[in-house]
């Protein structure tokens, strides 16, 4: 006769290990620690002022864009990233982004793209309210920090049509 308690204990330990592994994976996917969201003002279809009060770093911004665990940009967008395989085709190519959008327009598209298109599939990278189907690791946390948003904006404004 099997001991039910020991089989249950093994299943519980196994389930706890799986839950712990999934939690570790989710928290390592890029969600930033809770931070106080910095205020911003939307003017028309743009956020004209930097979220941080300073310009971002385009080199760091490029790193965020190509990091599939952090920025997730290349899941939907393609761009001038020859070293990156399997770039997305669902959204506009990022090549020439600053020829199509101003710095402020790019910032709003990153912070809250639903302000421009309520049906967009693009995530709001700097918003924590009015979101649906958000994983536990992402709740009450922006995907990117204000500094990372500014870094991505700084990178995107370097992408001009040739």
Stretch-by-stretch model annotation:
Residues 19-28:
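Bacterial N-terminal signal peptides
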């Amino acid at each position: 006769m099997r001991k039910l308690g020991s089989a249950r204990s093994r299943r519980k330990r196994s389930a706890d290990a799986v839950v712990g592994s999934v939690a570790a994976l989710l928290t390592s996917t890029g969600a930033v620690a809770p931070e106080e969201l910095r205020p911003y003002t939307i003017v028309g279809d743009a956020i004209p002022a930097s979220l941080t009060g300073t310009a971002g770093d385009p080199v760091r911004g490029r790193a965020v864009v190509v990091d599939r665990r952090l920025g997730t940009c290349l899941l939907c967008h393609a761009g001038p990233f020859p070293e990156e395989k399997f770039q997305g085709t669902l959204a506009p190519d990022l090549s020439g982004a600053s020829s199509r959008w101003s710095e402020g327009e790019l910032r709003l598209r990153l912070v809250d793209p639903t302000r421009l298109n309520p049906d967009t599939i693009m995530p709001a990278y700097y918003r924590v309210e009015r979101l649906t189907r958000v994983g536990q690791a992402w709740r009450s946390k922006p995907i990117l920090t204000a500094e990372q948003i500014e870094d991505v904006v700084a990178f995107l404004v370097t992408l001009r049509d040739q």
